[in-house]
Amino acid sequence: MKIRKYVAMALCATVAASMAACGNSNDTQKETQPAAADNTADAATADSTADNTADNASDAASGDLSGTIVITGSTSVEKILNDMKDEFEALNPDVKIQYTGSGSSAGIKDTLNKVNNIGASSRNLKDDELVDGLQQEVFAYDGIAVIVNPANEAIADITEEQLADIYSGKITNWSELGGNDAEIFVVSREASSGTRSAFEELIGLEDAGGLTENAATSEGNGPVQAAVAENENAIGYVSFSFIDDTVKPLTISGVEPTAENAKSGAYALSRPFLFCYFDDSVTDAGKAFLEFALSQQAQDIVTSHGGITVTE
C-alpha cells in the first residue's frame, strides 16, 4: 500500500537527520498492486497498513493543507466517501473534495487520463487498466446483495448458476425456481457500473451468454433498490449498505449476505472498495486524504454504512 510511503515521509519531516535514509527506504516500498488479489491477502495487507495509520487521523488536520482534491468513480462508495469527505474537510477547512459518482470504469479511465487526482473503484482493476506507476489502496470491502421484493415469500435462496440463468434470460419465470407463476422482472446496472462488472464476473454471466436484452437497467444502487421495492416480481443487486426493509436479500447457496461472510470469502458476491492514483497526480492534500481513509475515524464511517473495514 502506498500509504506507508506517506507515513515514512511524515517521520522524515520529524527527524530531519534521517531524511535521506527514509527517502531511500520509501523508494524500496513502491509497488503496484495486482489486478485481482486474493481477499485474504488483501485483508492482511490492509490490516497491517491500517494498524500503522489508525492513530494518525489528527495528522490530517495539520492546518497547512489546502487546495482541491478531485475524485471520480464508483457510486457504490458514495455514502462512505461523502462522509469521509465531510469529515476530512472539517479537519482541513482550506481543502475541498470534489467527488463525482460516475461509475468505477469511468473513474479508472479518468485516473489513467489524469483527469482526476484519485479514482474510486468498487472492483479490482482489469489487466488492461494496470499501467506502470498506477497505485491502489483498498480502504474497505463490500458485498453485493441479491434482492427481491418482500412479497416474493417463496424465494429465499439462490445459487450463482441460477443467477446467471436469470440474468442471461434462460430462466424467465419464478415458478422455475419453486416460486409463483410470474415473469421475472430483471433489474441490472448501467454498462459502466463497477457493481455490474463485479456481479457479472462473480456469477459467470459472460459464460452464460451475457445480459438478457429484456433486463431493465438503472444508474446507481438507489434506483435498483427502488425498482425492486416497487415490483413484486423483480430481482436486482445492490451494495450491502442499500439493504433495508423495502427489499429482501437472498442467501447465496445458503450463505447470508453479511460483512463477516463477505470478508472471509464465504459469501460469493464480495469485492473491494479501493482508490487508484498516480503519485504525480496526488497533491499533499490528496496524500493526507489517502492516509485519512485508513484511519480509525474513516474506518468507523465504513462501518456505519454497512461496509467491511480493512481491519475487521
Q: Can you annotate each of these PLM segments?
A:
Residues 1-10:
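Bacterial Sec-dependent N-terminal signal peptides
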Residues 11-16:
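Hydrophobic helical h-region of N-terminal Sec-dependent signal peptides
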Residues 17-21:
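C-terminal motif of bacterial Sec signal peptides marking the signal peptidase cleavage site
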Residues 23-37, 42-47, 51, 55-112, ...:
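Exported/periplasmic ABC-transporter solute-binding proteins
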